[in-house]
Amino acid sequence: MNILITGATGYVGRRVVKQLIENDKNISILTINRDINKAQSILPFSNCKHVSVNDMEKEVLLFSPNICIHLATLSTSRNDDEIINPMIEANITFGVKLLATLFKVDSLQLFINTGSFAEYRNGVENGFNDAYLYTATKSAYRHFVDYYSQLKGFKYINAVPFTIYGGDDTAKKLMDYMMESINAKEPVKMSPGNQILDFVHVDDVVRFYVSAVNSINNISLLPNGSNYYLGTGIGTRVKDLATLIESKIHKRLNIFWGGLNYRPLDVMYAVAPTEDNNQVIPWKTQISLDQGIDKLIKKYDIYEN
């Protein structure tokens, strides 16, 4: 099977590539990159070819992918003038060029698009209501995916990750700031902490993409454009998360609650409606929040004294 992956060197992407190769030594992977040297360093696998975005059309046509996993994105809460052009380029222009290239191949069966829970600021049941400029570009991009899907006839699904944590991402997550606050000299400023979020471990998110690849023979049974909500289905208040961490390490987190204001359109409740996920792709989380925090404590080497 030939799999095309964008964003392969990212937080989720690098884990997806490694897991796919671990599961199937005969798989062939093509990654599209802005920095080939970085890709070769992070993913030095013989059955994984890394090519430049400038050579995308030529290389994709030669590769003839069966599946495309689209993870590349510019994710930020910024909406200032300087971020607009790079965000449109990364989240829309590049993605549309990718689709235009895939239109020229006859092998593609499935396109896995990746969205964000913050596209649904007022809940999935209320449809799109973007919290950030970033998520507005993600919502807009879906229309392009749907257009090319209908034009060419390939199937597509939308993976919608909720609040991902865990692993060794260079971009710090909420839990990382919490853990680092323990030894901080000054309190770490955070919002009032009343958001209720669905914390999903990165390893569980990776399992979804692998499961989708393994389900390729049943993809015809899926309604086109199906959403898969990648979360546990359980919400936890941010302040309660801090309390849970404190109960495990028997130390206080040095946090100044309310030191930062909520963002203008902040998401106050985001829990994955996992019951809506079509079981054609048989996926559910395996790592509870309790287990995930234990992994994080081990990562930071923080134990009760």
Locate the predicted segments by residue.
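Conserved C-terminal active-site "lid" loop/helix of NAD(P)H-dependent oxidoreductases
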Residues: 38, 202, 227, 261-291, ...
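NAD(P)H-binding glycine-rich loop region in Rossmannoid oxidoreductase-like domains
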Residues: 52-90
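Conserved Rossmann-fold NAD(P)-dependent oxidoreductase catalytic core, especially the SDR/UDP-sugar
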Residues: 70, 96-133
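Active-site helix of classical SDR
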Residues: 133, 137-140
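NAD(P)-dependent short-chain dehydrogenase/reductase
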Residues: 144-197, 202-214, 233, 243-248
